[in-house]
């Protein structure tokens, strides 16, 4: 469930294992977006270690990973100054790549389909199906062609049930079915609650003299106050393009704070 990096990688790995062991299996991926990658909006830093294992010849197969990270900077901002901070291991992106996650996902979808994976875009998974013993049986997709009033239109198509020996939930952050499964099986028992943030990203085209291909910069501090969790990222990739993003933790206390307005100040 979900044609993102995790779901497609799982589908590819299953097909690879089936081929290695001489078994015929059907692998189906349902994706609510109009195409694979439609909801993958991040301008991402990608560590290729997992891709090296999954598809060792990814370079020959044209994976959209071309811009390596050449320099890391972490800064603390005030309204008028920027202070360089030490690079901690979690911010060391040496040998990683700056990439569009949407492009990477579309490429992974092509690799999956080449292996025989069936991908169904435009189908939102709506319900988890269970066996009588309580184990997961599969999922049901939502009805299509329903009007604003909730009534079927002329193009109505009922949802379909997909039964499987194994169901993998790869919906990403706050997936609707994942929440059902977490509640059903108490998967969050004795666990710390998840934290969430609201991120805003834009792609800028900058003059060539200001473009530093491969530069990755993260910041904390201004324009947020000391009580508000968040920060920014600036990634210089190809063609004078820069991904500029700003993230604010959703636990901010000031009810008048607008993450978008803070992004504009930044």
Show which residues each predicted segment covers.
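Residues forming the flavin
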Residues: 1-266
């Amino acid at each position: 469930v979900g044609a993102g990096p995790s779901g497609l990688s799982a589908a590819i790995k299953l097909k690879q294992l089936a081929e290695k062991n001489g078994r015929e299996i059907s692998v189906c991926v349902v994706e609510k977006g109009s195409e694979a990658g439609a909801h993958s909006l991040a301008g991402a830093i990608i560590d290729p270690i997992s891709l090296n294992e999954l598809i060792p010849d990814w370079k020959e197969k044209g994976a959209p990973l071309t811009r390596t990270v050449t320099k890391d900077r972490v800064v603390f901002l005030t309204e008028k100054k920027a202070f360089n901070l030490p690079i901690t291991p979690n911010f060391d992106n040496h040998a990683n790549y700056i990439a569009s996650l949407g492009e990477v996902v579309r490429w992974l979808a092509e690799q999956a389909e080449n292996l025989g994976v069936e991908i169904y875009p435009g189908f939102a998974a709506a319900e988890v199906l269970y066996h009588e013993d309580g184990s997961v049986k599969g999922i049901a997709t939502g009805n299509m062609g329903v009007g604003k009033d909730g009534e079927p239109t002329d193009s109505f198509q009922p949802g379909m049930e997909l039964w499987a020996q194994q169901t993998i939930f790869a919906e990403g952050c706050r997936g609707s079915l994942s929440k059902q499964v977490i509640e059903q099986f108490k998967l969050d028992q004795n666990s710390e609650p998840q934290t969430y943030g609201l991120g805003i990203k834009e792609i800028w085209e900058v003059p060539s003299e200001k473009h530093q291909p491969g530069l990755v910069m993260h910041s904390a501090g201004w324009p947020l106050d000391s009580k508000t969790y968040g920060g920014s990222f600036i990634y210089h990739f190809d063609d004078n393009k820069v991904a500029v993003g700003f993230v604010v933790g959703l636990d901010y206390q000031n009810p008048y704070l607008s993450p978008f307005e803070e992004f504009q100040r930044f």
